[in-house]
Amino acid sequence: MVATSKQTTQGYVVEAYGNLLRVHVDGHVRQGEVAYVSVDDTWLKAEIIEVVGDEVKIQVFEETQGISRGALVTFSGHLLEAELGPGLLQGIFDGLQNRLEILADTSLFLRRGEYVNAICRETVWAYTQKASVGSVLSRGDVLGTVKEGRFDHKIMVPFSCFEEVTITWVISSGNYTVDTVVAKGRTSTGEELEFTMVQKWPIKQAFLEGEKVPSHEIMDVGLRVLDTQIPVLKGGTFCTPGPFGAGKTVLQHHLSKYAAVDIVVLCACGERAGEVVEILQEFPHLTDPHTGQSLMHRTCIICNTSSMPVAARESSIYLGITIAEYYRQMGLHILLLADSTSRWAQALREISGRLEEIPGEEAFPAYLASRIAAFYERGGAVKMKDGSEGSLTICGAVSPAGGNFEEPVTQATLSVVGAFCGLSKARADARRYPSIDPMISWSKYLDSVAEILEKKVPGWGESVKQASRFLEEGAEIGKRIEVVGEEGISMEDMEIFLKSELYDFCYLQQNAFDAEDCYCPFDRQIELFSLMNHIFNSRFCFDCPDNARSFFLELQSKIKTLNGQKFLSEEYQKGLEVIYKLLESKMVQTV
């Protein structure tokens, strides 16, 4: 039998429709409450999604084969919650926060009705006591800390405790398991409370204590096209829509490896199973370029593949953001990668159809936009009571059918995010990786980033705008060349076209398989961008289009070689010197 609270409300199945059950209830229940359905000597986890009189509709998170009319249903009395505490990092969970490595020990395939603790109860943690007897604390205040990898994991007063608590007893510093009572307290009403290292929080409610503040720190990801053309601030939101095969998942894998954040929560809610396996095989062997440790030391993975029931997709995306919010409350910078929010939206559409709700555009529920907005609004930078700041940056991959950016999920996402990184099938087919199309992408953070970088790089904002103008003009001239040929345009237009192509090939594109070019530090980007602007501001003298193309191809080859050399090495400095000499040989004037 499953563990439930003292409330023992029960019911029985009246009707089953896929994973949606209609249940007659004998007692009090509430929407969002967890229920367990009896089938074949096991219990399947479910959630109440609609209450009508003495009947409720529940969505079951697992395969419902074998459920019959009259099957017993038990209601737990608590909402769908995440278990939060030390030990989540390096964890690999399913959408219900079961540890997959533990389930793998019991069976090759996931058995339905098997649930395990998200946090290991046997692991011993070195606990350092911070609170003192007599101190008055409230939700989110620190009781003590444990060392989780390189992070000081704060053991906090549970966020479900909305009253002030006077501490009456604290444990001494030492080695304890997570279920050890580390402090006791008394509320103003006289209620006695005991605190362990673990707390629970409903995943569909925002997890926040503190003041939301404007984002003011750049999130360096090592991709020049993102850091320069479509920058994102820590605490910002952005999306990566693109058709099948455009490189959304590869882009998200790059972000999880190289983004300058403390912790990455990777939520694979609808990825193909093979891509999830690739993550699990690669990440333990990859090194974090910022710390030199394994990438798994800063990563938490929620794997919910397309082959799992649709209801679990919704729980997995909310579970991921709840874990991310929990670590943000410790003053850490978090990146949540959701791949893909379209699969979540499809799950909403399927459940909405079974509930017989009035459909919206393309049969998605009418509340789709508000659900997506509520999800992205849980991101942001937060200032805690102790003055520390944490941030949660959200990146959602969107998979529009046929690459149609006008479909409802993409449009609902674009209305709430701060940056749009549109992936193009045409660029992917042309092997222009990363296949982010700078012509359709945008960022609301450009001016903020320019303001931050103004002291270090004067005129950064204007330089980025100039580069964008060259890309736009070059694209227009390229279309004319396809019609009338190179002989039908002026030499000045030919020069603009070749400069835009040079910028695209040598700056916006990167080689993910090159040890140096796969990750470009910000200082290196600034130097390379300075070189590109020097080329933009220079006028050259050519006799004919062929000579111009030959010169820019030679220049492109040398800059590409430079990108593959170790930054500030002797070879790098020599290569840079050769490039500037080559420019001087053809330069007429500098603007």
Curated annotation (Swiss-Prot):
Keywords: ATP synthesis, ATP-binding, Hydrogen ion transport, Ion transport, Nucleotide-binding, Translocase, Transport
Superkingdom of origin: Bacteria
Enzyme Commission number(s): 7.1.2.2
UniProt keyword Transmembrane helix, yes or no: no
The keyword S-adenosyl-L-methionine is annotated on this UniProt entry: no
InterPro entries, alphabetized: ATP-synt_VA_C, ATP-synth_a_Xtn, ATPase_a/bsu_AS, ATPase_F1/V1/A1_a/bsu_N, ATPase_F1/V1/A1_a/bsu_nucl-bd, ATPase_F1/V1_b/a_C, P-loop_NTPase, V-ATPase_asu
An example Gene Ontology biological process: proton transmembrane transport
Similarity annotation: Belongs to the ATPase alpha/beta chains family.
Residue positions binding ATP: G242, P243, F244, G245, A246, G247, K248, T249
HAMAP family documented for this protein: ATP_synth_A_arch
Protein name as catalogued: V-type ATP synthase alpha chain
General function of this protein: Produces ATP from ADP in the presence of a proton gradient across the membrane. The V-type alpha chain is a catalytic subunit.
Catalytic reactions on record: ATP + H2O + 4 H(+)(in) = ADP + phosphate + 5 H(+)(out)
GO molecular function ontology, one term from the record: proton-transporting ATPase activity, rotational mechanism
Alphabetical list of Pfam families matching this protein: ATP-synt_ab, ATP-synt_ab_N, ATP-synt_ab_Xtn, ATP-synt_VA_C
